[in-house]
Amino acid sequence: MFLINVLTVTLPILLAVAFLTLVERKALGYMQLRKGPNVVGPYGLLQPIADAIKLFTKEPVYPQTSSKFLFTIAPILALTLALTVWAPLPMPYPLINLNLSLLFILAMSSLMVYSILWSGWASNSKYALMGALRAVAQTISYEVSMTTIILSMVLMNGSFTLTAFATTQEHLWLIFPMWPLMMMWFTSTLAETNRAPFDLTEGESELVSGFNVEYSAGPFALFFMAEYANIIMMNALTVILFMGTSCNPQMPEISTINFVVKTMILTICFLWVRASYPRFRYDQLMYLLWKNFLPLTLALCMWHISILISLACIPPQA
């Protein structure tokens, strides 16, 4: 029974990932005044299936001097972790109801660094290694601000449990009183998922596509799927934390539709940012976090602690 539950969560995610690639190509196409994919199937709707068949039927090429085991296991680890993070997300009911679901998500997203690092090191290419080191530095740096923001959210929520956020936000979404944190959180999720304008790991001109330069066919597709699964997951988490997914026990499907629509809107914002902004310079990326985001998030965290103490109020207890 548990296996069926797992499949009913993972298969729709993989399907959503496939069609998100099509949505991205279509959105970028229309923003650049062109059509995007429109040959395979009606309006190009079968393009993801054609891409999947092409990628998984090609022979993967292994560099002669690479570490075969790590080279193969890194993309598998990336996709496994990307799908595991979905387990505690309430949609409106989670696959596994953890008491410390926010900590679990942070731990899993930290582990994703290893798949990037292994892939860069195992390729035995200086470009791949430099791209991997950039990705690791960027991911670890932005996790600092994300953790501080989550701490502020937990102070308002009174619990690390994600299902408790729906109760907290029954009357008012947390995006309104905590909009500076929401802005910084959204920017941090862009950096955490290595998306434009923070896609420094894939610098085509200086790093020849970064840590996955040696990957092709199936293993490359696994990295690609992991990246897009992380994008949808981060947006789903943003909706849960800031945009209140209140669950009606009589009609849970209504809250699921509500949740999905909000997640789609945020995901399209991710694509819109990619179409609009140029890539950051590496020093600007680090300056933004360590000089701007970190002091501001720490100050807001202290502010939220002092509000609770000074007003002698406690958040809703789960």
From Swiss-Prot:
InterPro entries: NADH_UbQ_OxRdtase_su1/FPO, NADH_UbQ_OxRdtase_su1_CS. GO terms for molecular function: NADH dehydrogenase (ubiquinone) activity. One of its GO terms (cellular component) is mitochondrial inner membrane. It is a multi-pass membrane protein. It is an enzyme of class 7 (translocase). Belongs to the complex I subunit 1 family. This is NADH-ubiquinone oxidoreductase chain 1. It comes from Mammuthus primigenius (Siberian woolly mammoth). The gene is MT-ND1.
